[in-house]
Amino acid sequence: MKHFIGNDWDHVLAPVFESGEYHKLHVFLKKEYQTRQIYPDMYHIFTAFKLTPFKDTKVVILGQDPYHNPSQANGMSFSVMPGTPLPPSLRNIYKELYDDVGAQPVNHGYLKRWADQGVLLLNAVLTVPYGQANGHQGKGWEMVTDAAIKALSERGQVVFILWGRFAQNKIPLIDQDKNVIIKSAHPSPFSANRGFFGSRPFSRCNAALKEFGRAPVDWQLPPNPEA
């Protein structure tokens, strides 16, 4: 079995990692990283899976692909590296977080505290070329992340937070008899006022976890980003 991640995700995703299609993706990415500026750093590609093992995952916040500007992407959806200005979508997430559960905004965008509590911060596509949003869409990452979503869905008792049309296109992969889906508009400035603000995803998530008999997420981030 190939050990790309270093925890139980390697076993869960083994059929994908051992496939010819994944080998093609691996060859493509090797060339991309050698010839272009690709984000995140190759050692951070699987950070979301490394920080949140399969057995511990109780929430999924699904993004599209990584931030495509320098010093932003860190392998977790919506999260940015410490010391990086907050992207507009994350500012809006923090605003809703405060309005929903009273979590005090912080001046960094490093979301590791959530990941450590079982929140899988998953992008559907795990790499992106500099300045080219969706530049690696359709290159093969979807088979990995779709397999992860399906495996979690089959296990059950997961809350899937799906913001925007792209994330909601994954709903057919999720068994809604065994899991909870929380959906709204995307927190982007282009759509936040059309249903994201006021959607209360964080309190609704914790209410669903309580129904599952699982511990709620403490959404309050630390004032200083953790290393």
UniProtKB/Swiss-Prot annotation:
<comment type="similarity">
    <text>Belongs to the uracil-DNA glycosylase (UDG) superfamily. UNG family.</text>
</comment>
<dbReference type="Pfam" id="PF03167">
    <property type="entry name" value="UDG"/>
</dbReference>
<dbReference type="InterPro" id="IPR005122">
    <property type="entry name" value="Uracil-DNA_glycosylase-like"/>
</dbReference>
<dbReference type="GO" id="GO:0097510">
    <property type="term" value="P:base-excision repair, AP site formation via deaminated base removal"/>
</dbReference>
<keyword id="KW-0963">Cytoplasm</keyword>
<keyword id="KW-0234">DNA repair</keyword>
<dbReference type="GO" id="GO:0005737">
    <property type="term" value="C:cytoplasm"/>
</dbReference>
<dbReference type="GO" id="GO:0004844">
    <property type="term" value="F:uracil DNA N-glycosylase activity"/>
</dbReference>
<dbReference type="InterPro" id="IPR002043">
    <property type="entry name" value="UDG_fam1"/>
</dbReference>
<comment type="function">
    <text>Excises uracil residues from the DNA which can arise as a result of misincorporation of dUMP residues by DNA polymerase or due to deamination of cytosine.</text>
</comment>
<protein>
    <recommendedName>
        <fullName>Uracil-DNA glycosylase</fullName>
        <ecNumber>3.2.2.27</ecNumber>
    </recommendedName>
</protein>
<keyword id="KW-0227">DNA damage</keyword>
<feature type="active site" description="Proton acceptor">
    <location>
        <position position="65"/>
    </location>
</feature>
<dbReference type="InterPro" id="IPR036895">
    <property type="entry name" value="Uracil-DNA_glycosylase-like_sf"/>
</dbReference>
<dbReference type="InterPro" id="IPR018085">
    <property type="entry name" value="Ura-DNA_Glyclase_AS"/>
</dbReference>
<keyword id="KW-0378">Hydrolase</keyword>
